[in-house]
């Protein structure tokens, strides 16, 4: 999954979270808004992360388009990055800090990998 999926409704959010849960796939979600310059600035960096971490599903959520999801997950500032496993938020990072986001994504994806013992 080397791309960022744009979430445009609560239904699409629920669909992708459910799919990821069924496939044991971690989710990194970027909550953004068009009026938030730091958030918009992070979009290309977020796409780069999605390209480099193919084991995770990367979702982008415009809080003005999908208010109910942002509200349900208590997203109050942009940008907010949420890390979900099995449909549950495991970590949250608020702010446009590329180094910290990359570090968190790396640790999160590594810890989410399933080890298969033959």
From Swiss-Prot:
Pfam families: Thioredoxin. Ubiquitous. Keywords: Cytoplasm, Isomerase. It is found in: Cytoplasm. One of its GO terms (cellular component) is cytosol. Residues 2-110 form the Thioredoxin domain. GO terms for molecular function: protein disulfide isomerase activity. Its main location: cytoplasm. The keyword Isomerase applies. PROSITE patterns: THIOREDOXIN_2. SUPFAM superfamilies: Thioredoxin-like. Possesses low disulfide reductase activity, but efficient protein disulfide isomerase activity. Does not possess deglutathionylation activity. Belongs to the thioredoxin family. This is Thioredoxin-like protein CXXS1. It comes from Arabidopsis thaliana. The gene is CXXS1.
């Amino acid at each position: 999954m080397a791309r960022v999926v744009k979430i445009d409704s609560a239904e699409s959010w629920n669909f992708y979270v459910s799919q990821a849960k069924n496939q044991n796939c971690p989710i990194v979600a970027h909550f953004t808004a068009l009026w938030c310059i730091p958030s918009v600035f992070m979009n290309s960096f977020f796409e780069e992360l999605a390209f480099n971490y193919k084991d995770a599903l990367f979702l982008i959520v415009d809080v003005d388009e999908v208010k109910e999801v942002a509200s349900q997950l208590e997203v109050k500032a942009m940008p907010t990055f949420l890390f979900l496993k099995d449909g549950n938020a495991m970590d949250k990072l608020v702010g446009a800090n590329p180094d910290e986001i990359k570090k968190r994504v790396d640790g999160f994806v590594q810890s989410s990998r399933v080890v298969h013992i033959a």
